[in-house]
A protein has these predicted regions:
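Conserved alpha/beta cores of soluble small-molecule-handling proteins
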Residues: 1-162, 181-185, 192-241
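Glycine- and Gly-Pro-enriched alpha-helical subdomains that act as flexible
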Residues: 168-189
């Protein structure tokens, strides 16, 4: 997908995507520590700015990064979604918000929120608990571990991997799962799916959780990618639908 031709910043408003926005000092003194979050946006539907600001502020505080006021985040997001609608109509986009140089930078890429291509997911062991610094680093522009995981899985024909310790399905390493069960629809990966719901792309009847799910209870499954595109799941290891 092609990156949208414009970006939005809390300091300077809208700019063309080729415009330099970040100082060399910011790149050299804090590489990989800039707080970031990715979310889907739909023109005409305001993102949950308060929740996004809290998410960004936690890692900013941990790494000693100056956090802009919530009003600056709201303005940058509003400018972006308004411009998205003006240029592209009711087009859904996946947006990346980065805090750098004491400002908010918003960029995005158009997506198709519902995809027909089925995906295969690998099975894996539950990753060991991460120390707090690694949990916070995962919320920044330091994406080496995620990119390595994506490459390794793609090399084996898998889009993601699902922990299956004790015979239960856990939250995927990269994305999220939405599963049909006899008791209703369940989403594994509450934080990511909460952003999908906030954009109006997931129904409110789906129960969001990070608790493991019994595989035998799953009658059908969908995978939500890191880009918030939802695919039908063909298999998780030897489990097939």
């Amino acid at each position: 997908m092609t990156t949208l031709e414009f970006v939005s910043t809390s300091a300077d408003g809208l700019s063309e995507s080729a415009t330099p926005l970040v100082s060399a000092a910011a790149l050299l003194t804090g590489p990989g520590t800039h707080p970031t979050v990715t979310l889907p946006v739909v023109p005409g539907r305001a993102p949950d700015t308060e929740a996004l600001w809290r998410w960004l502020a936690e890692s900013a505080d941990f790494f000693g990064i100056e956090m802009p006021a919530i009003a600056h985040l709201r303005r940058a997001l509003t400018d972006f979604t308004d411009e998205l609608q003006r240029r592209h109509g009711p087009r859904t986009a996946v947006v990346t918000v980065v805090v750098v140089d004491a400002q908010v930078v918003v960029s995005g890429t158009p997506i198709s929120p519902v995809r027909t291509e089925p995906v295969h997911l690998a099975r894996c062991s539950m990753p060991p608990p991460m120390p707090s610094w690694r949990q916070m680093a995962a919320r920044t522009t330091s994406r080496a571990a995620q990119l390595r995981t994506e490459r390794e899985l793609a090399g084996s024909g898998h889009a993601d991997a699902v922990p299956t310790d004790s015979g239960h399905l856990g939250v995927p390493l990269l994305g999220a799962l939405v599963c049909d069960t006899p008791g209703g629809r369940v989403g594994l990966g509450a934080a990511r799916l909460g952003r999908l719901r906030a954009a109006g792309l997931l129904d409110t009847s789906t129960t969001l959780t990070d608790a493991p799910l019994e595989p035998a209870a799953v009658t059908r499954a969908w995978w939500v990618s890191p880009r918030y595109e939802t695919h039908p799941v063909a298999s998780i290891g030897e489990l097939r639908w």
